[in-house]
UniProtKB/Swiss-Prot annotation:
Its main location: periplasm. Predicted to be exported by the Tat system. The position of the signal peptide cleavage has not been experimentally proven. Residues 1-29 form the signal peptide. This is Glucans biosynthesis protein D. PROSITE patterns: TAT (PS51318). InterPro entries: Gal_mutarotase_sf_dom, GH-type_carb-bd, Glucan_biosyn_MdoD, Glucan_biosyn_MdoG/MdoD, Glucan_biosyn_MdoG_C, Ig-like_fold, Ig_E-set, TAT_signal. Pathway: Glycan metabolism; osmoregulated periplasmic glucan (OPG) biosynthesis. The lineage of its organism: Bacteria, Pseudomonadati, Pseudomonadota, Gammaproteobacteria, Pseudomonadales. PANTHER family: GLUCANS BIOSYNTHESIS PROTEIN (PTHR30504), GLUCANS BIOSYNTHESIS PROTEIN D (PTHR30504:SF3). Keywords: Periplasm, Signal. GO terms for cellular component: outer membrane-bounded periplasmic space. GO terms for molecular function: carbohydrate binding; catalytic activity.
Amino acid sequence: MNRRNLLKASMALAAYGSVSASGLYAARALAAAADGEIEHFDFAELQAHAKKLAGKGYVSNKQVLPPVLADMTPLQFNAIRYDPNHSLWKDVHGQLDVHFFHVGMGFKTPVRMYSVDPQNKQAREVHFRHDLFNYESSGIDKNLVKGDLGFAGFKLFKAPEIAINDVVSFLGASYFRAVDSNKQYGLSARGLAIDSYAKRQEEFPDFTKFWFETPDKNATRFVVYALLDSPSATGAYRFDIDCQAGQVVMEIDAHINARTDIQQLGISPMTSMFSCGTHERRMCDTIHPQIHDSDRLSMWRGNGEWICRPLNNPAKPQFSAFADTDPKGFGLVQSDHEFSSYQDTVVWYSRRPSLWVEPITAWGEGEVSLLELPTTGETMDNIVVFWTPKTPVKAGDSMNYGYKLFWSPLPPVSTPLAQVHATRSGMGGFLEGWAPGEHYPKTWARRFAVDFNGGGLDRLPEGTGIEPIVTVTHGKVQDFNILVLPDIKGYRVTFDWVPDSDSVEPVEMRMFIRTGDRTLSETWMYQYFPPAPDRRKYP
């Protein structure tokens, strides 16, 4: 599978023993849609099965779909609707429910679904059948859809919008998404990333089976288990999903097993899109001032430091690594939720959620990895973030990672210091208020403006001296200005970067503000791409 061809869309288990006669009574706690044989299930056995599976050669279960499904358009795929009369927990009459996605287009891997009675640890498979779906608006002749094709994924609903608006979606490979209070999907998470930026082709593991614990009528949390499989790894996952009024919180227990040596293992990966923003205008020749699902990578390092790294749409792939030990959290953030910043009434970038990872086990040494790919539009995800352990992963290794995911407008935690409000860049070398027109600077320079607010900046005594501390990996910085910004109750720091060589290597910039010995802000980190020497000139 190729990353750019992966569609972005809105195991046979070992025998666990026979079922006693008394177990038949437990069937009433299993979903009515489940029609398979009763079998035993618990998470410990799933973990053992995944580890055993890693000791065997990988066998792909990708199927050849009939042309009527393989050649569907996205409109046809979206028009095939799951029938809410056959929802997984319709007979529970509770707060939660599950619908399934039909296979089709690029979603060729059959995903098997099971209903679980958590009291008796018994499961039954939900088999694919025509009457689970409505085909009328799709133009698909269901008589040409034959066999037990499995499902492509599932979506979760919570009262009061059961069967109306889903709040969580698992669809394709190990991708999944959730909404926040704005009810708008945005960036995605994945179960595992393998070799996203390595010498060999990236590998996309699949969730091949899911088990859903049947909830009590008054339950408000989903409990879902998953088996992950790929040529290089297997995994057993437990998802505790709490769909709150303003956010979705997932607690994940991931047990990962390596089939082969893995050059680059990505834990808790997330995927997003950044085309253009306040600091990056190369691809913004549209009516929209900004186009992105996320605008920054935010990190709360193990040593307590907060870092803001604005995202880029580079001309060529760029990989950045931020070393850390036991990180407190990191995530991709959509910090600006003002409609005026996007002017978008179709996909509503102003309503996109942020995604924050909070480790709840010791992750040890490693790095937060950031991959930024070039994109010419808004339909391809070009941002990938994940945790990479420092210790090389060898065949036979087993690892356990526990973490929470917060899908919310902004992360659930923030620095008590001032935060980066916005980053801007443009022509430098002139005094503000004398923008070039009939006159141009003699020396080429690039100007950066970084706005800070919060953290008590608006309460600093008048006349407080504020000092920006800036470092760059090459070139030099000059012409600093610090401006009060009453509209955001903060300050703007501007400076010019001037080259000192012909190098076009990325410039790594780092800045924070302080007064005396007191640090006032989080750390701003930025990667700037200087133009070629022959382009460093004005008319």
